[in-house]
């Protein structure tokens, strides 16, 4: 079976984990490897501050805390996303306002955002689906006009850009994931990027269980104490050590994944021309990171048959999000506003193909062969 995903591994990770435990004697949070990873993110993506977290979910939770939401405040987000995007803001007492996506990028529709803004709206959460950027100029203009915060859900967007700017660095906050399913992994982990300097100190406090420990470690106070709400969002330095090996090889991983993405896209171009499938769309002003490669089949039944055919042929393919507004918690904590033109339709038709670092040319060719065979090619 050709697996849908294989966690990335470049070969240096375990040596760095060993160094963390045996040489540095630092396996709790905020150790040397954590600092290396954070500096790398800040330097490579021109971020004001990057803080590693225990997950992409906890990065979103930190962003939600920084937004200072009150019960009943509204947060606008796409329904076509993972539950973490929603739960982070629900925990702050927010009401979720789900809106439709665009048919090309599968990202949140800026016009749909503008249409649902009320006096209770506080935050916009653009989700960069498949590592392809949302229309951030439009979204930021809307946010500025209505004095709203923007928290980018960029879990899939590490190494992607919008008009030359790294995803996660455009809004007030950006949230990355380094889960094993992502392009760069620490097993479980993430990062929050703070792009507005006014929030940097408080972000450190929230991450350090509500204490000003970071100020103490910098010698800015003679002792640290509890000053605000927060939680324990620091990952082990052993996890950061694992991630460091991959950040050192970030371009190699990127190039490898892009080779597979382009091989798929070239191989299926004729299927799209014949109307048998739809291919991913990447606008010219955006650079994506090959986080995933998906096809859209004509109907839900077609997709079900397609996934079954691939499985029988030794290829694991997966559908993706079920719209959050149709889930029990989605109905409880929010509602869909406007017309659902594309969200449910895309959810029912989209299927993702195997794509991971180190995928062999032979396996890539086999996936292409099986997909084309399904269509009699």
Where are these regions (language model features)?
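N-terminal "arm"/small-domain region of PLP-dependent enzymes with the aminotransferase-like
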Residues: 1-27, 225-227, 354
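Phosphate-binding glycine-rich loop
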Residues: 28-74, 88-92, 98-99, 165
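PLP-dependent aminotransferase class I/II
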Residues: 35-39, 44-50, 111, 115, ...
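Structural detector of well-ordered beta-strand residues that form the stable sheet scaffold
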Residues: 51, 76, 97, 150-151, ...
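Conserved SAM-binding loop
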Residues: 52, 77, 98, 192, ...
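PLP-dependent aminotransferase-like
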Residues: 65-154, 161
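Conserved active-site segment immediately N-terminal to the catalytic lysine
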Residues: 152-186, 215-217, 222-227, 278
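Short beta-strand-to-turn element immediately C-terminal to the catalytic PLP-Schiff-base lysine
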Residues: 176-177, 190-195, 244
């Amino acid at each position: 079976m050709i697996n849908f995903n294989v966690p990335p591994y470049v070969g240096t990770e375990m040596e760095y984990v060993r160094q963390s435990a045996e040489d540095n004697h630092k396996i709790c949070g905020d150790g040397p490897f954590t600092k290396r990873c954070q500096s790398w993110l800040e330097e490579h993506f021109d971020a004001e501050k990057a803080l590693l977290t225990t997950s992409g979910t906890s990065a979103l939770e930190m962003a939600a805390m920084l937004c200072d939401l009150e019960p009943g405040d509204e947060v606008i987000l796409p329904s076509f996303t993972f539950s973490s995007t929603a739960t982070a803001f629900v925990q702050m007492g927010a009401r979720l306002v789900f809106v439709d996506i665009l048919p090309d990028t599968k990202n949140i529709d800026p016009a749909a955002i503008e249409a649902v803004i009320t006096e209770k709206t506080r935050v916009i959460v653009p989700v960069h689906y498949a590592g392809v950027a949302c229309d951030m100029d439009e979204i930021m203009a809307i946010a500025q006009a209505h004095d709203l915060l923007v928290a980018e859900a960029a879990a899939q967007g590490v190494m992607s850009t919008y008009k030359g700017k790294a995803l996660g660095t455009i809004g007030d906050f950006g949230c990355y994931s380094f889960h094993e399913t992502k392009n760069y992994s620490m097993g479980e982990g993430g990062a929050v990027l703070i792009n507005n300097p006014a929030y940097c100190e408080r972000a450190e406090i929230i991450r350090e269980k509500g204490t000003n420990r970071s100020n103490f470690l910098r010698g800015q106070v003679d002792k640290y104490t509890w000053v605000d709400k927060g939680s324990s969002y620091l990952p082990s330095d052993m996890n950061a050590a694992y991630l460091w090996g991959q950040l050192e090889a970030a371009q190699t991983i990127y190039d490898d994944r892009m080779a597979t993405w382009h091989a798929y896209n070239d191989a299926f171009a004729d299927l799209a021309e014949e109307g048998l499938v739809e291919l991913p769309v990447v606008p010219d002003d955006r650079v994506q990171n090959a986080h995933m490669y998906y096809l859209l089949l004509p109907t839900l039944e077609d997709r079900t048959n397609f996934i079954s055919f691939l499985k029988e042929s030794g290829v694991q393919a997966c559908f993706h999000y079920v719209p959050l507004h149709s889930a029990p918690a989605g109905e409880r904590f929010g509602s869909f506003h406007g017309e659902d033109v594309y969200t449910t339709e895309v959810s029912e038709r989209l299927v993702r193909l195997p794509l991971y670092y180190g995928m062999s040319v032979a396996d890539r060719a086999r996936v292409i062969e099986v997909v084309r065979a399904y269509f009699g090619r």
